Amino acid sequence: MTRNSPTRSLNLRRSVLSVPAINARALEKTCALDCDAVIFDLEDSVAPERKAEARENLKAFFSGAPLLNKERIIRINALDSIFGNADMELVLALEPDAVLLPKVDEPQDVMSISDRLADADAPESLRIWAMIETPRGILNAAAIAEAGRTPGSRLDCFVVGLNDLRKETGALPQPGRTYLVPWLMQVVLAVRAYGLDAIDSVFNDFKDADAFDAECAHARAMGFDGKMLIHPAQIEAANLHFGPDEAAIAEAEAIIAAFADPAAEGLNVINVNGRMIERLHLVQAESLVHKARLIAERQTAK
């Protein structure tokens, strides 16, 4: 990602499955799943007395068959916890695609991890994701995202954690997440201003497919790039909702073709199928077509 301008990641992040690192069987199953990314969780889903066992599970898993065409993210415990240092040593040893920091409250939380990765000569490809799941995290979302433009920060993505946010604020679960929308949109505005991606929070009732569909559609309409998932049954719907449909792809290709026509040279606004289209729409169209190509390549590589 270019740090001097808000250029977004080119990775697919429609479906981001969280898997407890303590569950060795679930780890193995991720290889065959169609999710775009996997979060290997060492934090909330692992009891304190089993943290060391979970780290050993991840060591064994990473030494085996690689996860092809999936981002691998390790969610660590807070660095100021008794587990944080051991988790970071594991991250440095395994070199996943990203480390996910829990309860990020301020820019310094990101920069301290960035400095630690730099001091350890971790590869630049090892990125940072931030859980935004506290009142301070929401209030400081823009400042945290801006830290992503600091040279060497490695910040790529925000993940919203509504379970913790509800607990800390007292906000009750509600269809449509009416009272949470301002907070969610604050996250979207922050990442868009500074070229990051945003992943929506988990939906806890994985058996309620209709409600999950509705929440995915809601998140996509707000501008989220994907959804954090707790069960493989949610992958297909997330991929569908956060991926472009055929009509959108066709429209984007028409916009690209229209601006490529020599007659459009030097024009900032043109007519495409009866609509006035600006060059800013060309950028959006190119991004959408690129995303569609990445999805097609994933399907071919299966």
Task: Enumerate the predicted regions with their spans.
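Expand to "…catalyze enediolate/carbanion chemistry for C-C bond making/breaking, isomerization
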Residues: 1-302
